[in-house]
Amino acid sequence: MVNKNILKIRKQLDKLDNKLLDVIKKRSLLVDVVIKNKKFKKDIVDKRRISIILRNISKKSKQKKIDTKITHKIWKSMIKAFIDYEYRNFK
């Protein structure tokens, strides 16, 4: 049986997950606007922008004392997912 402390912490994690979903939804809406402003499918992947984002996330992670391997993997995965989303929704 799982102890009560762990159950409390899991409830907090569930609340955070819901907040993350809200943030992802907001990000998706902004990406929709970006898609509408791109004229060509070849403009979807901006390697320079991706590099800047990952560098900034690494820097901010260090400042906040967050394991940079975690944030790097999360952001790379998110960027890849949103690039896929852009390709699927580009018109």
Regions found by a protein language model. Name each.
Residues 1-91:
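Domain-level signature for soluble enzymes in the chorismate/prephenate branch of the shikimate pathway
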